[in-house]
């Protein structure tokens, strides 16, 4: 159970509740979108260049609760503190460890997830924290233009069922660049690192987002 002294609850609206959790990296913030009859918690964090308002995280928070999945959008301490730059990976991992008791408090299996840098954190810490599975959105396989600096080992080492959702034109790693491994991969056609698609594409932005939510809904439904 999370220490009551470490957590503050503030209800923002009927559909969302915000929770401040003290971690060894500083205060983190969880925005809960709770399912009425939840069977899973999906915790998702942001990347190094944006927040939980990202289109994929917002869409999942809107779509999944109706299907029995509570969504927890997590803001790392550096974002809560208003800093411009993300800290080192070990500090991101420290913040994620610190919020885990609050995520596990409902007593449900927790799927650890995130986009970009948040996906790396989820992969690195999944086994240690006892995550039920990992959702990796826009996994940054390598820095743009530097495929030799691969982060595949983090993905391959998650140790739990893992779904990667990747834009077809992601400069941090296109779907065809990913190595074979014990994970599932769904491509968002023409999507960039933020899953934005060009206007000339044969898929609309709304359809691209639907690829993400449909894939995650099907995958979470398959988890035992």
Residue ranges and their predicted role:
Residues 76-77, 136-144, 167:
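Active-site nucleophile loop of the alpha/beta-hydrolase fold
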Residues 114-122:
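Gly/Ala-rich beta-loop-alpha elbow adjacent to hydrolase catalytic centers
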Residues 121-125, 145:
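Hydrolases whose catalytic domains are alpha/beta-hydrolase-1, hotdog thioesterase
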Residues 158-159, 164-166, 170, 188:
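Short beta-strand/loop motif that positions the catalytic acidic residue
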Residues 171-177:
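Conserved alpha/beta-hydrolase "acid-adjacent" motif
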